[in-house]
A protein has these predicted regions:
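Amphipathic alpha-helical repeat scaffolds
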Residues: 38, 58-62
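Structural microenvironment flanking redox-active thiols in thiol-disulfide oxidoreductases
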Residues: 65-131
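Sec/Tat signal peptide C-region and signal peptidase I cleavage site
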Residues: 16-21
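N-terminal "domain-start" segment that seeds a small globular fold
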Residues: 22-47
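Bacterial N-terminal signal peptides
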Residues: 6-15
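Thiol-/selenol-based redox modules, centered on thioredoxin-like
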Residues: 133-185
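Positively charged n-region of N-terminal signal peptides that target proteins for export
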Residues: 1-4
Length: 185
C-alpha cells in the first residue's frame, strides 16, 4: 500500500512540475524573449532592451507607494547614457489601486511625475490563470510582488538578479548596488 502512495506522490509531483514549466512559458530563458504591449497599445518586444539592465516595477496610481514614481523617474534620468532602463507595469492587483484606463494612467504619470521611462499595458502580477507572462517569468525567480512597487533587477542577458519589496525606495543603497553590480560597475 505504501508503494502505491509513493508512486502517486511521485506522479503528482511530476505532473505539477510539468504544468508549472508549461505555465511559465516552458522554454523562456530570458526576460528579453517576452513580448507585451506598451501603455499606448502598441506591441512591445522586450528584445529591444536586451543588452541593458532593467528595473521592472509593478506600479499603481492610488497607492501609498505611488510617490516612488518620482524616485523611479529620477533614477531613469540619472542613468541615461548607461545601458539601463526602468520599465513600469501598471497593475490593479493590490487594493484596486490602479483602476484607470491606459489613457488615465498615462495622463496621471505625465502630469504628476513627468514619467519618461517606458510604461506598459496593465498586467496581472499575481499567480492566476490570467497572470501576465512577464510575471510568470519573474515569479520563476521565487518572488512575486506582495504589493505595488515591487522591483526586479534584470541583467543584460535577461536573468533576474535581485528582487526588492515595495518598501525599498528607488534611491535605496541596496537597490542601487544591485543595479551597479548588474551593470558590471
Amino acid at each position: 500500500m505504501n508503494s502505491i502512495w509513493a508512486w502517486f506522490a511521485i506522479a503528482s509531483a511530476a505532473a505539477v512540475t510539468a504544468a508549472t514549466a508549461q505555465n511559465l512559458g516552458g522554454d523562456v530563458k530570458s526576460f528579453y524573449e517576452l513580448k507585451t504591449t506598451y501603455l499606448d497599445g502598441k506591441p512591445a518586444d522586450l528584445a529591444a532592451f536586451q543588452g541593458k539592465v532593467t528595473l521592472v516595477v509593478n506600479v499603481a496610481s492610488k497607492c501609498g507607494f505611488t510617490p516612488q514614481y518620482e524616485g523611479l523617474e529620477k533614477l531613469h534620468r540619472e542613468m541615461s547614457g548607461k545601458p539601463f532602463e526602468v520599465l513600469g507595469f501598471p497593475s490593479n492587483d493590490f487594493g484596486g489601486q490602479e483602476p484607470g484606463t491606459a489613457a488615465e494612467i498615462a495622463a496621471f504619470c505625465q502630469r504628476t511625475y513627468s514619467v519618461d521611462f517606458p510604461m506598459f499595458a496593465k498586467v496581472v502580477t499575481k499567480a492566476a490563470p490570467d497572470q501576465s507572462p512577464i510575471y510568470k517569468f519573474l515569479g520563476a525567480s521565487g518572488h512575486l510582488p506582495g504589493w505595488n512597487f515591487s522591483k526586479y533587477v534584470i541583467d543584460k542577458e535577461g536573468r533576474v538578479t535581485a528582487f526588492f519589496p515595495s518598501a525599498v525606495k528607488p534611491d535605496a543603497p541596496e537597490l542601487r548596488s544591485a543595479i551597479q553590480k548588474a551593470l558590471g560597475e
